[in-house]
Each structure stands twice: as C-alpha cells, then as structure tokens.
Amino acid sequence: MIKIYDTMTRSLRKFVPLTENTVNMYVCGPTVYNYIHIGNARSAVAFDTIRRYFEYTGYQVNYISNFTDVDDKIIKAATQAGVSPKELSDRFIAAFIEDTKALGVKPATQNPRVMDYIAEIISFVESLIEKDFAYEADGDVYFRVEKSEHYAKLANKTLSELEVGASGRTDAETALKENPLDFALWKSAKAGEVSWDSPWGFGRPGWHIECSVMATEILGDTIDIHGGGADLEFPHHTNEIAQSEAKTGKTFANYWMHNGFVTVDNEKMSKSLGNFVTVHDMLQTVDGQVLRFFLATQQYRKPINFTEKAIHDAEINLKYLKNTLQQPLTETADEQELKQFVIAFQDAMDDDFNTANGITVVFDMAKWINSGSYTEPVKSAFEKMLAVFGIIFEEEVLEVDIEALIAKRQEARANRDFAIADAIRDQLAAQGIKLLDTKDGVRWLRD
C-alpha cells in the first residue's frame, strides 16, 4: 500500500487513484531559456523514480510534464541572443530532452507547450471573468484572491498574513490591482514582445494559468498527483489551485508532492545565487547514470548536498552494482530470502517513495548475491529494483576474440599450463577485462 506525503494536508496519506490501476500525474516542467542545472534535474529524476515505482507495482501512469515556452525570462534571453522566443525555447527544449535522456528519465506521456494552448487559456480566463473571479484592468486580467476560499492553504498561510507582506508594494502593476495579492492571468503586450490577440487586446498568458489549463485539458478537472519543486508551493501551485477550483468547482489535485532542493555547501542551488552547475556541463565529465544515482540516493522530499565526494561515491557504488549483475548464475538460492528482500524493498518505497531505504535494501541484496545466491529469478528481481531508480545496465558483449581467449585460458588451466594461462590473463587485463576465478567458474568484469 503506497502512502504519499501530501503537502496540502501535511500528512502521510494512503494513495487511492481516481481510476483503478491508473495514475494521472502532472509535474511542472522547465522554463526553457537556458540549460537545466542539477537542482532542476532533481525534480525530473525524483518524479521519474516515483513514476517508475508506480509502474513497478502495476499501475499505468499518464505522466504529463510541460514546457513553459512563454515567459518574461525567455523574452529577455531571446532578445539578448538576437533570436525569436520560439527559436530559443526550441533549442533548450531539445537540450532538456537530451540531458534528461542521459539521466535515464523516461519520456513523458505528453510534454505540452504553452504556445499550443493559447486559445484554451483565453477561454479559461473568460470563464473566470464570467464567474467574477477575475477582472480586466488596462489590458491585463487579474485573479481576485479574496474570492478564493482557503487561498494559500497549500502554503499553510492565511490571506491576512500574505496581505501584510504585500502591503508595501508600489509598482505600476500593483496600482492596477484591486488587491496587491491579485495575480496576472493575462498580461498586455509591450512593444516588440511575442503576443496573441484576445478580448482584452494583444497580450500573453500569466505563468500560473498555463499549467492549470494544460493539466485540466489533458487529464481532466481533477488529477491524482500534482508535483514540482518545493519552491513552486507558493505562489505557483497556490495560484494554480485558486484559479482551477474557481473555474471547475472541483478539487484540482488529490495529492500534492514537492521535491527538496539540491544544495551547495548547504545553500540552495539556483541561477540567481550563481552557485549552479548545468547538467549539460556535468555530462562532459560525469556519466549520466552516476549523476542519476547521486540524485536518487536521498528521499525526494529531503535536500541533497552536491559535492565532488558525493559524485565519486555514487560512481563507486554504481560500479559495485554493475559488477554484482555480472556474477555467474548459480543453481540455487533461498527463495524465502529473495521474497524477504522484495518485501523489504516494497515496504521502503511504499513509505512515500523512500529511495534511501530502498537503496539500502538493494545493497543488502547485492551482498547476498555476491555470497553465491544468484539464480535467474534473483537476477530478474534485482534488475527490476534497479530499474525503479533508472539504473539499467546494457548487457556487456564480449568480442569473439576475447571470448576465444577466455576459453583458451580455461583450456590451459585444465592442462596445468599456468604460464600460458597467466599470459592470457595479462592480455585480457590490457583490454580492460578483469577475470575472477571462483568455485563456480570464471567471473569477468570490465575495469
């Protein structure tokens, strides 16, 4: 039985899907104006792991993750680069797909783009105006937060607490608002900006409305799980809830999940702080699976500190698991012990996808395998566990000449011609093939 920590209720709740054996997930994707950094990748890897575990347990998962390709940051970056916003966003969408593929992130069921949903966004905003949840002001359209019952309950804040923080704002946009907390659903276009015609003049969507529209258009008025980074809890997800539930009158998402930050020297990694490392740059020197394994070692809600040592440890641990998979199969293994490993793994992951405890079980099982318990069922169970973490090793294929050398060495050993056997071992070692002579035969692995 899977239990999820729901940010809305601040409690662990049993997962009950809207549709039996199906999970509908919407995870906020990147604003595509630059390469993603390791902190951004944490969200992609965390929710991919969650998706994979749902699939491991037999669920069909509809996994939707958007690309925000209309945004102030994109417009600014495109202007600086001398290209159109679409050219810039296309470039970094391609980079995101390439980077996350290297991290073993499965393709989403759909990756909607804001530019493809402009008509639906306009219709959504019109509906909110008709219901008196929104108003037009000088070409902009704002959402009335005071009309939203329990506004900001996701962030565990009251409207009065938020109003105190907003009371000192004096910018031009705030002057148009009925309440400083009201947020933009539609922004009037400035000269030279990308824009679309609407009942309120040329403009473009506000950030928050985009996800509400894409999520409900694809998955319906109520979805099982909405996820994203902890920094999206307020205001982004808070505003999504307000506008979505105002339009439909229904609960927007039954479970809210937020992943923790990647930190550097225990400070959040971010572009604004200038302490970030892009995945694109990291992949020049670090294998994608190593980076993935590092990100998966901590339970998704907890922060994870990025250090060279942590990456080095991930590399060593991954190599150990790979070598474990290359053990020669044995004829027998304790079936009850195998069953206990599987149960322990599921207990760990059922507890709010506790990957830290799940990986501990994996290493305990690897130790058991290395002690001589490695039948085909054991191998299958072990590979399925690793796949939950996105760790999938391709079968090593030995070239014909290497296979022949191993066979020739075995023949020499059988004939007690140890000089030839040792020479062949040295020859294989020079090609990166390490041989281990065990009671069950020759075990090999690549250095």
Curated annotation (Swiss-Prot):
Name this polypeptide is given: Cysteine--tRNA ligase
Binding site for Zn(2+): C28, C211, H236, E240
CDD domains assigned to the protein according to its UniProt record, in alphabetical order: CysRS_core
Self-association and partners: Monomer.
Species of the source: Streptococcus pyogenes serotype M28 (strain MGAS6180)
Stored Pfam families: CysS_C, DALR_2, tRNA-synt_1e
Short sequence motif 'HIGH' region: positions: 30-40
Record-listed ATP binding positions: K271
Gene coding for it: cysS
Cited HAMAP family: Cys_tRNA_synth
Cofactors, names only: Zn(2+)
Localization per record: Cytoplasm
EC assignment: 6.1.1.16
Top-rank taxon: Bacteria
Disulphide connectivity of cysteines: none
Alphabetized UniProt keyword annotations: Aminoacyl-tRNA synthetase, ATP-binding, Cytoplasm, Ligase, Metal-binding, Nucleotide-binding, Protein biosynthesis, Zinc
